[in-house]
Amino acid sequence: MSDTIEFDSKAFLKDLTNQPGVYRMYNHKQDVIYVGKAKNLKNRVSSYFRSQVDSIKTQSLVKQIAHMDVTVVHSEAEAFILENNFIKKYKPRYNVLLRDDKSYPFIFLSDHQHPRLANHRGPKKRKGEYFGPYPSAWAVRESLRTMQRIFPIRQCEDSYYRARSRPCLQYQLQRCAGPCVEGLVSDEDYQAQVDLARMFLKGKNKQVIDSLVQHMERASTDLRFEAAARYRDQISALNKVQEQQWVSGNQEEMDVFGFAYRNGIASIQGLFIRDNKLLGSKSFYPKVPAEATDEEVFQSFILQFYLAGNKVIPKQIVTPLELNEQGAIEELLTKEAGRRIQFYRGARDEKRRYLDLANTNAENALIAKQGQQKSVFARYTELEKILEFEQPIQRMECFDISHTSGQLTVASCVVFNREGPFKADYRRFNIEGITPGDDYAAMAQALARRYRDVKDDSKIPDILFIDGGKGQLTQAEDYFEDWKHEKKPLLIGVAKGSSRKAGLETLILAGNHATIPLSGDSIALHLIQHIRDESHRFAITGHRARRQKDKKTSKLESIPGVGAKRRQSLLKYMGGLQGILQASRSEIANVPGISAELADTIYDHIHN
């Protein structure tokens, strides 16, 4: 007999207010399983407990409710915002969840005598102009590379710029005009290039080309043939870029979303147009509860997408579906953006062209996602069969260790769920206080740091893979011997064969250390190889980053009279270790807090 008390909906509804607000539903474990908002709380919550409820999702949800609570707000707009905040906080299983709600990157043009172009993500605190948002950091990097080939504008940090006494490699490659060194470019000529770059970022390519043609003709008339050739090369490079861009005619600022949804998988494709230019696209796969409708999935996505931090809301949003509460959402986003925001569904002409493209991409992405999931599902099923699992494997983790001759050791922990890599739960550990090269001690420390504070059973893996042989596996066995949780992972060591070739791994079970026979073409082995390779990659990239950071500071750490603050000041002012190595004694003495005498000491130390 169950010792849980059934939720008394009648008693709860009796005193429920008719005001707008947000409601939260909890199960018997006190987990929030659903968050909703309502213009009228009493009417909305009552609808869940009617005798005739057609939705299978709602029926399943209601059966699990142990208790509810509500938060009353002043308006429907406040309810939208609070609902979104609660969904981000609790990640309820019956809500549609946007997995990627981070801010998007911009191209930043600084407010400086000689402005720089840079990648920017986060709050817009620095003075300057921001262009975007771009769909990914890759899109920003590609745009900056393209601009560097066309406009010789610096992309270096201000500290590096200040420390220069001679031009860097970018000047030699003709990718920077060298404003850091007096006499290489006049302020007027540099500003002219900045103005052209600004027009380019605003999508005014024709005006840029017209201006460059005028400059080229003027330079040719004045017999400045070298300058004329540079303008000619700029025009040629710009024409090549323009051939590759799909330029919008009159859509200065617009987001367009395509949508496809089948068998519990939703694919949403966003196209982002700014300043008459398609900046790029991005695929989204929100986590969708069973039996969710198209409208529910898409509206939840739109709200979570635009209410996430540091999002720029465009004037026009083109959607494939009518939103259930479109008027209220338009009003909310208008208030958030501080200007009028409009949704378009019955799109025509250019908007229709973009919408068709977005829908086609969403459909193609959905087909690819379904194929990927079928492949992953088959691999999991095969592994469950081999290991005789009675329940589906929901979570697997794998550990690996990376170091160089025992120094700067880094341990990695990667996580896979039924959909493949779950990168939000990846972790790295910088290993300290062990004998250099002692991989067993490194593994023991990593395991202890990863699992000592685990409270949620869902964060405990069903299978824990250890990249290594019996010695590494023994460390995991020792750690879990006194494990206090009811759920305990199955421990498996993944030992490389003598040739270290894929397909020749030995899988070792904890306890009796029996090996698991798997053929090289086994799809279950392919899944294990995937998680092992991912843990290896994650460990190596972490170790390389740590090694690179150590290189930057190790040469400075042994200099007499140079502590942590002065090291940071040197690195910041000189733009990194290379800047310090190339600096003269007098340039080092210009760093705040560094005397001429100390500058001599620093110079002698790093050059001897």
UniProtKB/Swiss-Prot annotation:
BP-aspect Gene Ontology terms: nucleotide-excision repair; SOS response
InterPro entries recorded: GIY-YIG_endonuc, GIY-YIG_endonuc_sf, GIY-YIG_UvrC_Cho, Hlx-hairpin-Hlx_DNA-bd_motif, RuvA_2-like, UVR_dom, UVR_dom_sf, UvrABC_protein_C
A GO term, aspect molecular function: excinuclease ABC activity
Subcellular compartments: Cytoplasm
One Pfam family named in its UniProt record: UvrC_RNaseH_dom
Domain UVR: 206-241
Domain of life: Bacteria
Keyword line: Cytoplasm, DNA damage, DNA excision, DNA repair, Excision nuclease, SOS response
A GO cellular component entry from the record: excinuclease repair complex
All residue ranges annotated as the GIY-YIG domain in the record: 18-96
PANTHER family from the UniProt entry: UVRABC SYSTEM PROTEIN C, UVRC/OXIDOREDUCTASE
NCBIfam families in UniProt: uvrC
Family as reported in the entry's similarity comment: Belongs to the UvrC family.
Annotated function: The UvrABC repair system catalyzes the recognition and processing of DNA lesions. UvrC both incises the 5' and 3' sides of the lesion. The N-terminal half is responsible for the 3' incision and the C-terminal half is responsible for the 5' incision.
Subunit structure: Interacts with UvrB in an incision complex.
The protein's name in its UniProt record: UvrABC system protein C
Organism: Pseudoalteromonas atlantica (strain T6c / ATCC BAA-1087)
Gene name per UniProt: uvrC
